Swiss-Prot record:
Disulfide partners: none
Cofactor details (free text): Binds 1 zinc ion per subunit.
Role played: Involved in allosteric regulation of aspartate carbamoyltransferase.
Keyword hit for Zinc: yes
Binding-site list for Zn(2+): 113, 118, 139, 142
A Pfam short name: PyrI
Name under which the protein is recorded: Aspartate carbamoyltransferase regulatory chain
Protein keywords: Metal-binding, Pyrimidine biosynthesis, Zinc
Chain ranges passing through the membrane: none
Amino acid sequence: MTDEGLTEGLLISPIRNGTVIDHIKGGEGLNVLRILGLTGTCTVSLSVATNVTSRQMGRKDIVKIENRELLKEEVDRIALIAPQSSINIIREFRVFDKKGVDIPNQICGVIRCPNPGCITNTNEPVTSRFTIQQSGLRCHYCDWLITKDIASHII
């Protein structure tokens, strides 16, 4: 059987109120959940679609979070691994607000520096701080540059 002539439909049910994170690079949806602290033990109702066909992106992920609107700090975290994503606020099954994410200039307390000698990885009470650059994330304290696999460094 071919898929010619089939109508496009919803892959996951709509939510009444909450947040839909769309246009996440295919395969990154679970990392988005991780950086939001939404794990298997949370009580929030979640829907995740992975590697959905997208005309714009080829493949994308979608995350739906019922009865929760994201804070700016959470959106900034998402921007680190999904800079092309859009955040849709849903109220009574309708899109109330839709916007893209903005990559912040600096992010604190979100990324763990991979340099074992960095002051943020010692027993000192220092919060990690990274400057976002075109080439990657640069540690404010030791100048270490993270250029790939940013999701694995998220605290």
